[in-house]
């Protein structure tokens, strides 16, 4: 630079530093060249966070040096602040417990989301494995994937309250309606549904308490397929969560007209449907 070689210039660059490191990396993401968001909130809210450069008209000499400032063409605009709903204490707790659970169960990966049940706000979102956005040059690309939003799975028995709610709303059962689960099996065509433990006759309330697959299937089969589908669709199954994060998926809820009886039965306890966290 001291030689004043034409075309060789010095440029000041800035880089974000993320105090939470790998604990919140999948939420915050990171920026790349020229401070442009590449992942997470940094990418999803790039338009809000990024400032707008200004410009001025001036005169420079043949060495590229400014010799006269003539006028301002456009004033620069600073980026705006963005407040998240994350609770830092819960985020650290979620990260710690998820890491421990993945390691204890020798799992390949895991995700954890904590929501405020009243507002729906995300209080914590963690993934393992993770990466440190402050030294991401050493991180494998797969570690940057926000599995809580991009990966889908069958929700299993966590779906039972929704299928039973559909029947309660439709008036086909009441909380105290008896449901015969027999010896804990139910055969539909060539397939047989099993309960972990035979429980005989259960009330609808007990079907949830005991997590009876047979009971949930019988309750669901007492509904028109479209009724069950509508309840699941109304609460958001089969649609993206609309968090604004890049790569989020919607899961899968097939149209009711394509369901076979066994599919309606197994869907009542969370099989044959896919969701993200």
Predicted segments — roles?
Residues 5, 35, 90, 98-119, ...:
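Flexible, solvent-exposed loop/hinge segments and secondary-structure transition points
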Residues 53, 106-109, 180:
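Short, small/polar residue-rich loop motifs at catalytic or cofactor-binding pockets
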